């Protein structure tokens, strides 16, 4: 007997998360490791749990996520977007709640490219008048 699964994909900066929601007790597994082990900072743990807390479904679903690329903050944001998108597939009535909180919006901010003649994206070499 196959269990019901809901999928959601999230991206943030260079991170990509493929999230799977299954009915369960509230376990969150990221890259085959528990949430507490993968994200050690409390702010990142909270970021991942935000959509579940807002919709009061934290103890109703098990979350399995595969995330790659980027840093920890980008990965946490990607997982959050993936969870929110999967929750909308579970129950479409959650959409306005998640939309109002901004959890269904893909954050478009990316790292700015480095320009030639500059040291970084905007940092110029020291200017000497004489």
Swiss-Prot record:
The keyword Iron-sulfur does not apply. Residues 111-130 are annotated as: Disordered. Pfam families: Ribosomal_S9. Keywords: Ribonucleoprotein, Ribosomal protein. Gene3D superfamilies: 3.30.230.10. It comes from the Bacteria. GO terms for cellular component: cytosolic small ribosomal subunit. HAMAP family: Ribosomal_uS9_B (MF_00532_B). PANTHER family: RIBOSOMAL PROTEIN S9, SMALL RIBOSOMAL SUBUNIT PROTEIN US9M. NCBIfam families: PRK00132.1. This is Small ribosomal subunit protein uS9. It comes from Thermoanaerobacter pseudethanolicus (strain ATCC 33223 / 39E).
